[in-house]
Design a protein with these regions (language model features):
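Intrinsically disordered, low-structural-confidence terminal and linker regions
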Residues: 1-16
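Short Lys/Arg-enriched alpha/beta "domain-start" segment
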Residues: 16-57
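Active-site metal-binding core of divalent-cation-utilizing nuclease and nuclease-like domains
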Residues: 56-72, 76-80
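Short, well-structured alpha-helical interface segments that form or flank functional binding sites
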Residues: 70, 84, 109, 236, ...
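A broadly used, surface-exposed interaction patch
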Residues: 71-123
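Internal, well-ordered alpha/beta segment that forms a basic, Gly-enriched binding/recognition surface
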Residues: 115-138, 142-280
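Hydrophobic, aromatic-lined core segments that form the binding pocket/scaffold
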Residues: 210-492
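Acidic, carboxylate-rich catalytic segments that either coordinate divalent cations
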Residues: 476-523
């Protein structure tokens, strides 16, 4: 291999790439690099001061936000002689970005403690700026009226300029980011329980996760039992299924629709009629039909023809479109498509019986289901377990939604399933198994309860998400862990964060979990 000095690509990169650009003092670094510098605190931390001269002590830089708003959430910062506070941090290139980007008019930025910037361009204008004195003053960026409470909650936060406070030249930090992207949290930013948990072997870690997972599972089961007392077992299950189809963005609109199921289900048996009714009730139908005839417009016209005849009957319970959130949604998770899937489930009058039969079916070797009430005794293949439930829940083919993400999207080249393995796992862990378990408990069928618990324990891990990633890094100090090979172990990790992390701050003040782990491991 040629020496590095003879590497022509290295020469190109040095002369014309990011490193070269960062040598230009008039060329600000990319904001992504500033975010990495802040996250890993590549700063001369003892020299940090706000633009007005107050000292800044960063007890924790916060966690990267994945859902818009400020760049970092949950930071713990002490400014001057004040007590440390928890809040958000926003990163911008220029101090003037606070107003230029509309942060001062955005309620999502009301908890920002510190505005971290590369240079002080605009900082004096920001300091002298006054909030609008007149109520109802227009906000040109968002073209809406600003309520007084929003204006009062969002004065400019203290500004911290870091361009001259780095712990290494900016070009060197640029190479650090490009060549060795830091994926795990630095040791000092992990939770205080991380050391205690990492001292345990995989088996003992698994025991803690399993115990937490059982707590979470039983809490979900209790929720179904409580709802069934008022609405019945079948209605409780449908509400759970709809909630799960809403994911984190649209849980409540889906729940609202499901609660009204006894009213709108009557007289709409075929899947298409149910699709039209659900899409109409949801408020997600386009307000106007297109003038030109495109590929999917025939389906939309048929839906409107169906909904037009009955919309007055349901006008008092039709949801406004504004209750739905679309930002950050994957196309496959669009609520229009999820409601189409729910319509197919509702059209299958035997769906609940199929789910109940599945709970006692022999799955590991593909044999037929056992007589109702009997529980299989042999081991279960996790892969076949997922496949067996997917066959019950999946839709073979939908004339429109197998080929489109939304009403307005182009026709796909290949049909896409309305339900994948990742969503099956969400449904089984959060809805189906807890519902089946609590029904078995009500019937005092302990044998069936144990079988359902076993399926929960062996179900393959769920799709990764930002909550799990952060929890792994904070509690286990790793991007991946062999202890998290099942969906139930993931649920256990989430439960620990709910029970302990969410009741403390980023520096783990007054958190008893590390002490409890150490006591348990030595007991």
């Amino acid at each position: 291999m040629s020496p590095p000095t003879e590497n022509f690509y290295a020469d190109w990169r040095s002369r014309f790439g990011l490193a070269n650009a960062l040598r230009d003092e008039n060329h600000p670094p990319p904001e992504r690099l500033l975010q990495a510098i802040w996250r890993h605190q590549r700063l001369q931390r003892d020299r940090l001061q706000t633009a007005d001269g107050r000292s800044v002590r960063v007890l924790h830089p916060g966690f990267v936000s994945v859902e818009g708003g400020p760049d970092f959430r949950g930071a713990v910062i002490q400014i001057g002689d004040a007590a440390p506070r928890s809040g958000d941090v926003e990163i911008d290139l220029r101090a003037g970005g606070w107003r230029a980007h509309g942060h001062d008019r955005n309620p999502e930025f009301k908890n920002v403690l510190l505005h971290v910037v590369w240079d002080d361009v605009g900082v004096h204008a920001l300091a002298s700026a006054k909030l609008p004195a007149q109520l109802g003053s227009a906000c040109p960026t968002h073209r809406r009226t600003i309520p007084q409470r929003e204006i009062e909650l969002q004065p400019p936060p203290p500004t911290l300029v870091i361009g001259d406070k780095l712990d290494a030249p900016i070009a060197e930090l640029g190479l650090w980011l490009e060549n060795d992207p830091p994926r795990d949290l630095p040791e000092k930013l992990r939770g205080q329980c991380c050391v205690a948990l990492r001292e345990l072997d995989e088996k003992r870690q698994g025991k803690i996760l399993d115990a937490a997972a059982r707590v979470r599972f039983q809490a979900k089961a209790e929720q179904f039992r409580a709802r069934a007392r008022h609405a019945g077992w079948e209605q409780a299950l449908w509400e759970g299924l709809f909630r799960a189809l809403g994911y984190k963005h649209n849980v409540w609109p889906m729940q609202n629709l499901a609660e009204l199921r006894p009213r709108w289900l009557r007289g709409a048996d075929p899947a298409f009629a149910l699709q039209a009714r659900l899409l109409g009730l949801s408020g997600l139908l386009p307000a106007e039909l297109p003038r030109t005839q495109a590929g999917g417009d025939g389906y939309l016209r048929r839906v409107w023809d169906c909904w037009w005849r009955e919309r007055n009957e349901f006008s008092d319970c039709t949801l406004p479109r504004a209750v739905w959130k679309f930002h950050g949604l994957r196309p496959a998770n669009h609520p229009q498509r999820r409601l189409a899937l729910a319509a197919h489930w509702l059209a299958d009058k035997k769906l609940i019986s199929k789910i109940e039969n599945w709970s006692v079916a022999e799955i590991s070797d593909g044999r037929a289901a056992l007589p109702r009430g009997q529980v299989p005794q042999c081991g279960i293949s996790p892969a076949k377990l997922v496949d067996s439930l997917r066959k019950i829940l999946e839709v073979e083919r939908d004339e429109f939604w197998s080929w489109h993400w939304t009403f307005r999207s182009a026709r796909l080249k290949k049909p896409q399933p309305l339900l994948g393995d990742a969503r099956v796992t969400d449904l089984v862990v959060n809805v189906i198994l807890p519902w089946l378990w609590t029904r078995a408990a009500e019937g005092k069928n302990e044998k069936l309860q144990r079988a359902i618990e076993h399926r929960y324990a062996v179900w393959p891990q769920a799709e990764d998400n930002s909550i799990l990633k952060l929890a792994r890094q904070r509690l286990l100090g790793v991007g991946r862990s062999r202890a998290l090979r099942s969906a139930s172990a993931q649920q256990g990790l989430i439960q620990i964060t709910r029970d302990f992390c969410e009741h403390s701050n980023a520096v783990c003040d007054n958190c008893r979990f590390p002490e409890l782990v150490r006591g348990w491991s030595t007991g």
